[in-house]
A protein has these predicted regions:
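Beta-sheet entry/capping signal
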Residues: 1-3, 74-77, 88-90, 150-153, ...
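ATPase catalytic-site recognition across NTP-hydrolyzing enzymes
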Residues: 2-80
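C-terminal nuclease/phosphodiesterase catalytic domains that cleave nucleic-acid phosphodiester bonds
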Residues: 29, 33, 37, 161-235
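Nucleic-acid-processing active sites and adjacent nucleic-acid-binding tracks
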Residues: 66-67, 93-152
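Gly/Thr-rich phosphate-binding beta-strand-loop-beta motif of the actin/hexokinase/Hsp70
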Residues: 71-98
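An acidic- and aromatic-residue-enriched active-site/binding cleft used to recognize and process polar
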Residues: 81-85, 96, 155-160, 172, ...
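Phosphate/oxyanion-binding active-site loops and adjacent basic polyanion-contact surfaces
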Residues: 87, 128-137, 225-231
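Short glycine-rich phosphate-binding loop at a beta-alpha junction
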Residues: 147-159, 164
Length: 235
């Protein structure tokens, strides 16, 4: 039974903020309507699938489709989740499409971004050897030649010092960003509020659906699974 039935001193209005910030969790905890596996991070598969409405304009050889063109009015942001031997090395490119006014609780309004993840590219280690990070670096540099105005390229901490310096040497701004639970919570908010559009990639969807809440500060993948593409998009 819902909390407001069991406890007459509470009403559904008392939980407006909870339903606004995390509808799936609020349905389970306060309305006794579980929609999902309780330790899953993304609790609404339909919202994830709805957000993945774009084709990914990158083929298996990491070539960007000629028909995809950057918008000169947009600034593009890149995040790379580096890996060489055991995981995929993934790079995602995103931009803010526009800013919109959105009603929040108590009739307040807030100006918030509509975000588009334009593409995701990834490299996998092979029997012959690990991922060549210089190939990843050159792919990022080629984005500028493609016409993208790059605002920032961020990397997780693993093995990114050299590649950051090499990109800086050709005039590309870089920084370090270790994706954590806070970043995933921000992305979940975008998804639940229909403010994120991204490519439909089966690997990415599977990764995001398998993410688990491990602790107050950590979101992680199950054993023998991965979250490489997911981390790239989240960053």
């Amino acid at each position: 039974r819902p909390t407001w039935d069991v406890n007459p001193t509470r009403s559904i209005d008392d939980f407006k903020l909870a339903f606004y910030t995390d509808p799936g969790d609020a349905l389970m905890r306060f309305a006794c309507m579980p929609q999902f596996q309780s330790d899953a991070f993304f609790k609404q598969r339909d919202k994830l699938e709805l957000a993945m409405s774009l084709p990914n304009p990158v083929d298996k050889f990491k070539r960007i489709e000629p028909r995809w063109e950057p918008n000169p009015d947009f600034t593009y942001f890149v995040h790379a989740d580096l890996a060489q031997k055991h995981d995929k090395c993934a790079v995602a490119i995103s931009h803010v499409e526009k800013w919109v006014e959105m009603k929040t609780f108590n009739d307040y309004t807030q100006v918030v971004p509509m975000v588009v993840t334009d593409m995701v590219a990834w490299w996998e280690p092979k029997v012959e050897g690990p991922v060549d990070l210089s190939e990843v670096k050159n792919w990022i540099i080629a984005l500028r030649r493609k016409g993208l105005h790059l605002g920032m390229v961020t990397f997780d901490r693993w093995n990114s010092f050299d590649i950051q310096n090499e990109l800086k040497s050709v005039g590309i701004k870089t920084d370090t960003l270790s994706v954590g639970k806070k970043h995933y919570e921000d992305m979940a908010m975008l998804i639940y509020e229909d403010r994120l559009i991204m490519p439909h990639i089966d690997v990415l969807l599977d990764e995001m659906l398998e993410l688990k809440i491990v602790s107050d500060k950590k979101v992680d993948h199950p054993r023998k699974k991965s979250k490489d593409l997911s981390d790239a998009v989240c960053g």
